[in-house]
Amino acid sequence: MLTRKQQELLLFIHERLKDGGVSPSFDEMKDALGLKSKSGIHRLITGLEERGFIRRLPHRARALEVLRLPEQPAPLRVAPRTEEPVRFRPNVIRGDFRGALPGREARGDAEAVSLPLYGRIAAGLPIEALRDTTASIDVPTGLIASGEHYALEVAGDSMVDAGILDGDTVIIQRCETAENGTVIVALVDDNEVTLKRLRRKGNSIALEPANPAYETRVFGADRVRIQGRLVGLIRRY
């Protein structure tokens, strides 16, 4: 026999998996059920797991699978969401991006535009970005604005809480400045390129990951150069 909160959480997870194929984050579950802390979500998930309703998928950050539903589930009562909408927050990349990424101008008179495909984003570990200048991808013009753009591929599952799945392609608009909270491609120390959320803290810049298993990294402003911002995502089925 499940408690009402357990049933509500189980149905919430089930609906999110059915709609998007991605488990909700602990923060999303906490807010959906109107709880004040994530410790309550941990207890509910443990109870559901012990009763055989869900299981945690190994080697995947907070990935859950619904094994069964109660015969007479309680109606789902989800608290209204008040937090900032979840933005795309892809993972870490590396490569020689010190030279300007040329990108390509978007064309308003076509249904799709071909963009250079500059590399893959590894799950949890930085890797050398692929710089094959012959690689490209056709992108619907509705995903891009004016200016130069390029694409990066995603590999792995460490960004599933942000809706970024293995095999996704992220679309980046070249820029040298960005507003606080924007997901950017940042060049650190003219050596490492990373795709993170930008947080300015005084004279420092924090590069914020999506996965709580990874630490936010803080640098002096002179060590970080913005190479572009995230504007879209493509997923193949």
Swiss-Prot record:
Gene3D superfamilies reported for this sequence: Umud Fragment, subunit A, Winged helix-like DNA-binding domain superfamily/Winged helix DNA-binding domain
Site (described: Cleavage): 123-124
Enzyme Commission designation: 3.4.21.88
Residues of the DNA-binding region: 26-46
Active site: 158 (for autocatalytic cleavage activity), 196 (for autocatalytic cleavage activity)
GO MF annotations, alphabetized: DNA binding; serine-type endopeptidase activity
GO biological process assignments: DNA repair; DNA replication; negative regulation of DNA-templated transcription; proteolysis; SOS response
Acyltransferase in keyword set: no
PANTHER family, per database record: LEXA REPRESSOR (PTHR33516), LEXA REPRESSOR-RELATED (PTHR33516:SF2)
Subunit structure: Homodimer.
Family: Belongs to the peptidase S24 family.
Protein name: LexA repressor
Phylogenetic classification of the source organism: Bacteria, Pseudomonadati, Pseudomonadota, Alphaproteobacteria, Rhodospirillales
